[in-house]
Amino acid sequence: MNKEYLSDQKTQFNNKVVVVTGSTQGSGAETAKLFAHRGAKAITICGRQEGQGEAIKEQIETIGSKCLYVKADLSNVDDCRNIISLTDKEFGTVNSLINVAGYTER
């Protein structure tokens, strides 16, 4: 990414708490990292791939945002509620929720 562009945008999400679903890989992971570059105070990432989730969490923390990884299956309503509950307890009110997760019935 162009660092000059990122530095101009650094405070766009300053002090905001963001949840990004489907963020253990691909566009979800990149979206979560972009929020960190844009100054988000804290980001909750979630998905079913725990190893990848922990790796993305470390990358986000290196950028400068706090991060929580929650292993979750978004086809399970209790998991969805748990994501928001854990985020609220850890960081406070959720300001933005971005759904990148998809579901395909097999």
Predicted segments, located by residue:
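Aromatic pocket-lining residues of Rossmann-like dinucleotide-binding sites
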Residues: F35
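Conserved glycine-rich Rossmann-like NAD(P)H-binding loop of the short-chain dehydrogenase/reductase
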Residues: A40-I56
